[in-house]
Amino acid sequence: PITISSDPIHEVPKGGGVASFSVDGFSKWPSQLGFAATNNASVVKKFANIAKEEYLAVGIRTALHPMSDLATEPRWARNFGTFGSNALMSSEMTVAYMSGFQGEEINQESVLTMVKHFPGGGPQKDGLDAHLFSGKDQIYPGNNFDYHLIPFEEAVKNNLRVIMPYYGIPVDQTQENVAMAFNKNILSDLLREDIGFNGVICSDWGIITGRHWGVNDLSIIERYEKSIHAGIDQFGGETDTSHLIRLVNENKVLESRIDDS
């Protein structure tokens, strides 16, 4: 079945503009950082409830948000889209956001929330964003990798059904220095096995044909193969299915793996 999804569209005019927009006809609210400034999770849930009704009215069933990244690097251009740098506050706000959109149970009146960007897209080297090759590295001074996991762990405990990893490379945190979407240690070992997530892992947009940090030397079909075996279930922004079909026909990806997704 087709599921229509959307980036945030409720920000006040002249909002962030980086995967977050102000669209006519929808109610207007602050960015996530503005919600964090209220220090009031009930306000976040109220917003999410209203936004859910607006999404349902136009047929949107998946929200490509919230961003549960921690703003630990003040130079990062996407800090406005986070709930700040405090992991406990971000956790509380994330759960309220999810509850408002999804409801207490997932049903026909729910809009799924795709929490992003696992395992945290905030610790960008020099503040450069991972949409660009110059910002591909994520670093963890003070050995604080686990701190960035806290909001995502809390989301998984509260009925998270779909999650998005970021473009960046978690430098020297895993066996390979490759981007999250190609990193089995991140997606299968950490997210699936250690944290216990059993929903859908959807890649960020264009990881095969655009932003494939750490695997630039692989061919397109090899990137598909590596990302699927790493744990990706759904590809954002990629539309060519021929490579997937070929991988299955050549037994490089088992049909059972596709069934799992």
Residue positions per predicted region:
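Glycoside hydrolase catalytic-domain context in secreted enzymes
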Residues: P1-S261
